[in-house]
Amino acid sequence: TDIPYGEVNRKGNGLRELDKENADILTFDMQVFLNEVYRVTKGTIIIFCGKEQISEIHKFFSEKQLLRKGTVRQIIWKKTNPSPMNGEHIYLSGIENAVWFKKKNATFNAFCKNTVFEYPIGSSNIHPTEKNHDLIAELISDNSKEKDLILDTCCGSGSTLLMAYKMNRRFIGFELNKSYYDLAKKRLDAEMAQMRI
């Protein structure tokens, strides 16, 4: 899942700031979220997050690791074509972070694989933080089997759900933003109709 970590406004030139009108991060309770996701997950948890959130998420799962309830790692998505946003003022942000936690005995199909994944950014421009479909497919393949259930608690435009469906996984997704919910539903309905042909 890709939790809220703030949207920037798109107006004007120069440095962009947090768009407080659309920032779910201001009302997002990380500890409640982590406890609930841990409680309902049987296998692996992957949480894409902002750099400011890594420590809190990693600490939560490190405590579970100390109790021998699983293993935690940081995943890095190295973007081969980072967005040039603010590039005239600062270094480009060429990576995205995720925290990966595998509960004991969970599926893992990626023998001796590195935690750095190199892919271009998503190309559809339908969501500001859309993930590359091949990246999502690789993570699903590495951490699940066919017919497993994929949960995306912040599904945005539905990319993870779409890839889960294409890879013969069951899925459940949640999205608070009505526009993104409608878009995700439309994408999934179209894919399901196409697969039935």
What are these regions (language model features)?
Residues K185-I197:
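S-adenosyl-L-methionine
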Residues T1-D182:
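Core catalytic lobe of class I
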